[in-house]
Amino acid sequence: MYSSRRTAHRPAAARAVPSVLLALAACSASTGGPSAGSPVPVSTVAVPFADYHQHLMSPGLVELWSDPVLPTVELPEALDRVLRTRERVAGTSAGGEIYTEDAQVVELSPWVANWIRGRSAVEDLVSRVRPGARFVPNGYGIEGSSAWIATTVFRGDGPSARAVANFLFVLRRTADGTWRIAAESASLKPPSITAPVIAEQLVARLDEAGIRQAVVLSGAYGFASDSSAGPDEHARVRAENDWTAAQVASYPERLVGFCGVNPIRDYAVAELERCASALHLRGLKLHLGNSGVDVRNPAHVEQLRHVFRTANRLRLPITIHLRTPDPTYGREHSLIFLEQILPEAPDVPVQVAHLAGTSPGYSSDEAMAPLAEAVAAGDPRTRSLYFDLAGNVTPTISAETAQLIARRIRQVGTERILFGSDLDPASSPRREWGTFRGMIPLTDTEFRTIADNRLPYLPPGRFRTGSPPR
């Protein structure tokens, strides 16, 4: 599942532009792919047998992960005028009029820092931003000749309006009394989930795509992160796994449920055993980033080894979000996983989510590389290692990134690549598969192999699905 802050990839023609702004720009330039470099109509492509990376959303998780927009505030007229001008100049060459000569735009995240400095460079950026965004202020301050405005960016009107980003503007009053933008920073908002998503809704989305089965990954670990933990943590983790088990049980031939735990909690093994025996969940989902795991900490590694051994003993396949909170996450972290943790589960499929990174986009190739190299070298520790690419392929990835993903797929072999779409209210399994087919330069045979991959833990059955798209 998406992290609380995510970065999007940018077209090759604009590598110097902050990715968060280009995600809003929706530039029309080709970004690569098998032909035109855009998502192909789903009606023309093969249909995956299964979606190996899906989530439901319980009422408890909605409350935990919802990101409500702050109340709107009324700005002084002079500051409001700056925002309205900023809206108006998007997509035009007139943007420079509202910026200072030394203006800069910065995007900061745990993993990247991109800067643009100078009025002309910022003006060029603004000229390529898709118009139509609305900046809704939710805070401001003025001190002498300096001011700041915090805003939420919306696209769409009425019921379809959606918050897509948060912007912070820093303003400076010039000698003639005019307020100009001296700096602005932005962060993409994850898709807003405001209502539960239940099994019936997921099955309908699978039917729309003609996908027969899905693996539902419990988000119970969300209640055990450092930011959400409380005295009732264990009870909430149990309740979430209970809820997931009850949901997937209503579609036993279509849905497979995986238990969710924080692997470094002292109750992790007991909860995993309960999930297998009492709830009949068929696998384990681990999210190292959400769970605060540090694979450079020997105590954390030992606990992960214990959890992997337990899953192997219970014959529970594992899906692991390998990226940790460490901002230096990369090759060293993957090698620790490969050498010290993975060998503890030699008899079950182990699925590395998001090509060893996060989503959206593909930004962790340094972590993916040693795993792909080990597979290509025939390392026996990787005998049951698989990879999903949930959220890695977006309509805005560069041609260079698309080629890199294709190279990694071929390096590990298409038989190890699993389709997954994650839970994104703004997308669907149907759309995600079409985007993957349209953006990544693989052959039809390679796409067919990925679509047909079926891991042994999926239940047998006669499937009643909607007809695959024609």
Predicted regions and their residues:
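Bacterial N-terminal signal peptides
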Residues: R15-A26
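Mid-to-C-terminal alpha-helical segments outside catalytic/metal-binding sites
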Residues: A26-T31, P39-P48, L64, S93-A94, ...
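A solvent-exposed, acidic/Ser-Thr-rich amphipathic alpha-helical stretch
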Residues: A50, L64-D67, P71-L75, R81, ...
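Histidine-centered divalent metal-coordination motifs
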Residues: A50-P59, H321, H354
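Hydrophobic/aromatic beta-strand elements that line small-molecule binding cavities or substrate pockets
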Residues: V122, F135-G141, T152-F154, N166-R173
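Short beta-strand edge/turn micro-motifs at domain boundaries
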Residues: V164-L188
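Catalytic pocket-lining loop regions of alpha/beta-barrel enzymes
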Residues: R282-G283, R296-L418
